[in-house]
């Protein structure tokens, strides 16, 4: 309440003074009025104790005085060191983020950079791939996730007739020897021991060679004889119609055929007989004999 009379007195003194001194005292009066108004506003605002401010000196000092302040400070410093180490492992310097305009020294080329890849040899860039053993992770190799590899089936071995290891080579007979052997075989198919010895010496052959040749020639003659007999049997068979047509003929001559036809058309013999339907013969001995099923000799 003391500011109001002070302001009034200042104004009265200002207006009461002569014009020469009022011009010099006007700024000082305005400043005093502003100071009094600011003091009133500060008195009207509620004052906050300095201990409640988070960034005050008391608050900062109180944090250091707490029992767990040292542990928290150590943890913070360790976290900062770990962050700095990770930044260094990633190739980022601590001052590079804060000062982007600062000139940076060229970093060494890594294996995964463009320069590092260009400097690698060609063998390192090309990965060796093996079709037989592809790379697999351990969980893929377990039978739970991947089926067992299919076994390669080897091609079946060719089953050829195996000859004896101690088999003698085949005897190459000359043309003169073959003609003499054929002539002797036509005369006599079986030779005695004396005849075979004499004949083999005349052809400059051993007795075993002559013996084996005669055995083979007799087997060949037997096969040829059986083939000739089969041909004769096939030629002797009459040309009969196939059984698919089912043609059958009654036994007897033309008279029997005519009688059978009349009996099928007319029931009994007589002057006045009506036509009857043909009835198939029933019985074992009344049926016709089919040439398609039996060969008559």
Curated annotation (Swiss-Prot):
Residues 166-225 bind DNA. Its main location: nucleus. The keyword Transcription regulation applies. InterPro entries: HD, HD_metazoa, Homeobox_CS, Homeodomain-like_sf, Msh_Homeobox_Regulators. SUPFAM superfamilies: Homeodomain-like (SSF46689). PROSITE patterns: HOMEOBOX_1, HOMEOBOX_2. There is a cross-link at residues 9, 127 (Glycyl lysine isopeptide (Lys-Gly) (interchain with G-Cter in SUMO)). It comes from the Eukaryota. SMART domains: HOX (SM00389). GO terms for molecular function: DNA-binding transcription factor activity, RNA polymerase II-specific; RNA polymerase II transcription regulatory region sequence-specific DNA binding; transcription cis-regulatory region binding. Pfam families: Homeodomain. One of its GO terms (biological process) is regulation of odontogenesis. Keywords: Developmental protein, DNA-binding, Homeobox, Isopeptide bond, Nucleus, Repressor, Transcription, Transcription regulation, Ubl conjugation. Sumoylated by PIAS1, desumoylated by SENP1. Sumoylation of Lys-9 and Lys-127 not required for interaction with H1-5, transcriptional repression, inhibition of myoblast differentiation, or binding to gene promoters. Gene3D superfamilies: Homeodomain-like. Coiled coil: none annotated. Interacts with CREBBP/CBP, TBP and SP1; interaction with these transcription activators may inhibit autoinactivation. Interacts (via C-terminus) with PIAS1 (via N-terminus); the interaction is required for the localization of both proteins to the nuclear periphery and specific binding of MSX1 to the core enhancer region in target gene promoters. Interacts with H1-5. Belongs to the Msh homeobox family. This is Homeobox protein MSX-1. The gene is MSX1.
């Amino acid at each position: 309440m003391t500011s109001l009379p002070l302001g009034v007195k200042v104004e009265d003194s200002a207006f009461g003074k002569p014009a020469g001194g009022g011009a010099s005292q006007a700024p000082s009066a305005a400043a005093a009025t502003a100071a009094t108004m600011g003091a009133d506003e500060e008195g009207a605002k509620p004052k906050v104790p300095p201990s409640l401010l988070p960034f005050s000196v008391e608050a900062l000092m109180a944090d250091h005085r707490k029992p767990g302040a040292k542990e928290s400070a150590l943890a913070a410093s360790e976290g900062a060191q770990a962050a700095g180490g990770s930044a260094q492992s990633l190739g980022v310097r601590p001052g590079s983020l804060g000062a982007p305009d600062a000139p940076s020294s060229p970093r060494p080329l890594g294996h995964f950079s463009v320069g590092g890849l260009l400097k690698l040899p060609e063998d390192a860039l090309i990965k060796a791939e093996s079709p037989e053993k592809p790379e697999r992770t351990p969980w893929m190799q377990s039978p739970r996730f991947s089926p067992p590899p299919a076994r390669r089936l080897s091609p079946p071995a060719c089953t050829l007739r195996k000859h004896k290891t101690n088999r003698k080579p085949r005897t190459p007979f000359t043309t003169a020897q073959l003609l003499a052997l054929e002539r002797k075989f036509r005369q006599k198919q079986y030779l005695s021991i004396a005849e075979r010895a004499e004949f083999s010496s005349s052809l400059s052959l051993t007795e075993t060679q002559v013996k084996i040749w005669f055995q083979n020639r007799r087997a060949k003659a037997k096969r040829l004889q059986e083939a000739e007999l089969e041909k004769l049997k096939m030629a002797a068979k009459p040309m009969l119609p196939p059984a698919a047509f089912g043609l059958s003929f009654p036994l007897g001559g033309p008279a029997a055929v005519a009688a059978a036809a009349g009996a099928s058309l007319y029931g009994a013999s007589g002057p006045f007989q009506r036509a009857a339907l043909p009835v198939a013969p029933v019985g074992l001995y009344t049926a016709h004999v089919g040439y398609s099923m039996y060969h008559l000799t």
